[in-house]
Amino acid sequence: MKKGNFMFKVLLMLIAGIFLSIDAFAQQITVKGIVKDTTGEPVIGANVVVKGTTTGTITDFDGNFQLSAKQGDIIVVSFIGYQPQELPVAAQMNVILKDDTEILDEVVVIGYGQVKKNDMTGSVMAIKPDELSKGITTNAQDMLSGKIAGVSVISNDGTPGGGAQIRIRGGSSLNASNDPLIVIDGLAIDNEGIKGMANGLSMVNPADIETLTVLKDASATAIYGSRASNGVIIITTKKGKNGQAPSVSYNGSVSFSKTQKRYDVLSGDEYRAYANQLWGDKLPADLGTANTDWQDQIFRTAVSTDHHVSINGGFKNLPYRVSLGYTDDNGIVKTSNFRRFTASVNLAPSFFEDHLKFNINAKFMNGKNRYADTGAAIGGALAIDPTRPVYSNEDPYQFTGGYWQNINSTTGFSNPDWKYTSNPNSPQNPLAALELKNDKANSNDFVGNVDVDYKFHFLPDLRLHASIGGEYAEGTQTTIVSPYSFGNNYYGWNGDVTQYKYNLSYNIYVQYIKSLGANDFDIMVGGEEQHFHRNGFEEGQGWDSYTQEPHDAKLREQTAYATRNTLVSYFGRLNYSLLNRYLFTFTMRWDGSSRFSKDNRWGTFPSLALGWKIKEENFLKDVNVLSDLKLRLGWGITGQQNIGDDFAYLPLYVVNNEYAQYPFGDTYYSTSRPKAFNENLKWEKTTTWNAGLDFGFLNGRITGGIDGYFRKTDDLLNSVKIPVGTNFNAQMTQNIGSLENYGMEFSINAKPIVTKDFTWDLSYNITWNHNEITKLTGGDDSDYYVEAGDKISRGNNTKVQAHKVGYAANSFYVYQQVYDENGKPIENMFVDRNGNGTIDSGDKYIYKKPAGDVLMGLTSKMQYKNFDFSFSLRASLNNYVYYDFLSNKANVSTSGLFSNNAYSNTSAEAVALGLSGQGDYMSDYFIHNASFLRCDNITLGYSFQNLWKTQTYKGVGGRVYATVQNPFIISKYKGLDPEVKSGIDANPYPRAMTFLLGLSLQF
């Protein structure tokens, strides 16, 4: 009986299984269909997915697709540039995709307003930081590096929290600022840093940035007038949304940094061998027995962290966003560190059915720097005797803190027991240079602004916009140097440098937007006033602990300063569109600057731009493969008044230094001296012509643009030498000449692969720029030049760069080296270029320049399901560098390795060169081609969503990722790093290679 029951149950189960299978089979159907756009053209490569599953396919070249689905399923069809469609499943489906108007109407922020991307007439590029880039940048400038044609970003060096040199289409000036104007949420920022803060971009945490817009040509920048000759970078930060439930985001990372490359100097064993080769058994002084790698003593593997938390949300009419950030960035040079705390608040309330809108922004940053004495540390590590130990407990070294140093006996101090001191003319212990100097800076910066926008009830086309904003920043750098130190032995040093700045800005403008049939008008007029104030002082002293008296005191009253300048402006803009095809933009701005005398105070800066949407013409409207084609033409004039001195046109007296005092009895009083002035100073003016073509194919799957430009700057401002006795100084700021930049830019963005599971985004840009000085006021003398650039290590304050007519700014100005038949330089033998029978300064010539002729950038991002992989590359061609390291070591004779009773190290490269230091440092031999290909970063990530999801909780989404920054450089340049902003490669703080692990979460 039991057996019968069992068989009966098995039979029932089999029958049930058969019916279930039949039912399931009945639900499964084959879906066939075609996807077209609104013009009836097939959409190739559209994604067709069963909603809520991984089942899907893509359309073929005719727009057809086929897949299996169940009755009741929803089919989701999507493609780039179209609105996604969700449709119930059917055996035969005809899907029509409509253009995504949000993409077509994408708005780009420009000066004092915004415009549809499709209606822009100037050379403007906007980028939105990718969600997949979160956490891999600690500075806003990193987001621009290699991403935009015509924009060069070179970090100053590897210093934690260090700034960067940003150039848009080369420099437009010689001595005035070449930095672009930075505008953050509508407020133009003073780009001059203070102690502890590199520049205005340090103010913004990269995680808070929504978009970066770069205005490149004068037709786009002229609305900013005299502050826009070098382009404009507009940063818009993230904001909340109306009615949005609160959401919390977190981004965090930990990173490990190390040196990518080190200088190749002789080891202790190699140095002893070479010394024996030079002197034999007649060494001028004993060598040590150690084998110290001094670079190991100053470099380290550094661990850094970064955290950022934000809360977004919005009540009915009050969107809000609050964010906090903390960065702890340890440098690869021991003791160096940068800590940054940022906070930002945005409120955007609206009233009267959105007729009255407010936008309130407040940002705060506190930065704490611990600076390493990089010059002393790296210079010492490359020069000090490698046969000596780091520390010594011998008696003389108690006066150097137990660190081994080259020392001399002394009786020059008041304490008779202090019998030894450091030899000031010898290389110093690099670790002591770091550990015996505590150099810290603390800075606070607050930026806030309130925008009010009112759309008139009786005339909704008319808007009134008013804004008031300001910045307050303070920074103090405190330097404490031990009395056991190399440079301040016995006395030490304790001093402060304090700086303050506060700026105020307010503007008001009215805007009228009206459409009349085929005519669209956008008219704006307004005014603005900006005030900039700076003040500060220095104070400090050494201390004689034996006599209890100060030494070499620097007094606040001798160093205190205060300065200010004001800019008053009036501006207007007209945008006109006919038939949504023909575009016209005209702007005008008048600036009055307090930096010039009343006769030269005002500058006029107009611009004009034309645009033609060729794609909208009837002869191209039906060419579906072409999604965009627009021609742009622009002309404009911008100005420059950022000359560093607010009162260069006024006769002023300034306080002398402490060495120029006058005695009255037993008291010494500070004196004042007249300062050079030039009441004829006037504006630099830069005129720019631009022609561009924007294109798009396959409904935006391929987009790009090409631009050609010509820019000429007249009345260049520069500090030049003047005849003795003609003014109160040997140098004075003057308008000295003209400078030209012209070039081409090309950029392209593509999605080569778009499938259900895999997408590939690729961006490439290339820039060619030519820079040339066309006029200097030195007359017609072909040999006239203006000395420029940084000093090199050898010589007496020697510079090897110059401004000269017919050549690029900051070109190298050197002697032409003579070589033997083997290609080796013949020491102290140069070409007599002027043919006068002797080698003199007239034989120097212009040879190469630091700025590259061609810049390129490539970014690749791939996504496969939840995984992503990306990398960024940058290249520079024909940028040249003065190889200061080799030049400084290029004396491997006995006098080069031993002088002032101390040994100095050298390199194998210098030994092979075999020079003996007879003045070759101004030779073109040391100007090296530093073209390079650099990989900025490589990232692998994994995204997840709906983690811990419940019926009442949406779950947690996020991403984990691993990044390596600066993994490799390909270059023939033998120095530490081919990317040198000044062109003089003189022991900079090395750029690190960094390994980073990060986590992003959305709650």
Curated annotation (Swiss-Prot):
PROSITE patterns given in the database record: TONB_DEPENDENT_REC_3 (PS52016)
Induction section of the entry: By maltose.
Keyword Transmembrane: yes
One Gene Ontology molecular-function label: starch binding
GO terms (BP aspect): starch catabolic process
Pathway the protein acts in: Glycan degradation; starch degradation
InterPro entries linked: CarboxyPept-like_regulatory, Plug_dom, Plug_dom_sf, TonB-dep_OMP_SusC/RagA, TonB-dep_OMP_SusC/RagA_CS, TonB-dep_rcpt-like, TonB-dep_rcpt_b-brl, TonB_rcpt_b-brl_sf
Signal peptide interval: 1-26
Residue intervals of the TBDR beta-barrel domain: 243-1003
Keywords for the protein's UniProt record, in alphabetical order: Carbohydrate metabolism, Cell outer membrane, Membrane, Receptor, Signal, TonB box, Transmembrane, Transmembrane beta strand, Transport
A GO CC term attached to the entry: cell outer membrane
Bilayer disposition of the protein: Multi-pass membrane protein
Transmembrane segments: none
SUPFAM superfamilies linked to this entry: Carboxypeptidase regulatory domain-like, Porins
Residue runs in coiled coils: none
Description of the deletion phenotype: Abolished ability to grow on starch.
Family: Belongs to the TonB-dependent receptor family.
Subunit relationships: Interacts with SusD.
Role, per record: Mediates transport of starch oligosaccharides from the surface of the outer membrane to the periplasm for subsequent degradation.
Protein name as it appears in the record: TonB-dependent receptor SusC
